[in-house]
Amino acid sequence: MKFSFSFMPKDEKFFFLLHQSAINIHQVAMSLQDLMQNFENVSAKVGEIKELEEFGDQIIHNITQSLHTTFVTPIDREDILALAGRLDDVIDAIDEAAQYTLAYKIEEPTEFARHLSTIIVSCADQLERAMGMLSTRSSKLREILPLSVEINRLENEADQVLSLAMGDLFTDGTDVVHILKWRDIYNTLEEATDRAEDAANVLEGIVLKHS
């Protein structure tokens, strides 16, 4: 997929691309949740997530290329790069977790994995809403802040789920391979929420600079 933004104002071009990245995160998160809730056609579903991850890489490439050809940016270029990078990190973590389910030949996701995937969708929803508001001006920009706070809360919830999951994992049996597989999956799912929190923190900094 290619973007047609040649005739967009420079302000709108960057906001459009960042919003597209957040929309893509939401799509990837929903695909992950579907994988965890309906664990069938796993190879096809993981492949779909990989395609969305590659599309996300294209968005980030477009942002980087646009920065090289734009003298004046609507917000600091360092903030644009940081935000784009953190958004890309969210997708990378989701894709990695999905790839693990295929590579490790997981028979069925656990309730902990399903719970974490639901939290990731909630984080993605908040990010998409926040990125859609980024182009607003003045005091309205501050409406992003409650969304950032909610992402931080969700990340804390994911930490708690991870702690419970790891505790259950190490008391449920002595199958070392099983433990190692699920340790990787749990940690990577939780990492997606960490990266969402990183993006929220960058957003918060942008809001405080420009509102």
What are these regions (language model features)?
Residues 1-211:
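Cytosolic, long alpha-helical scaffolding segments
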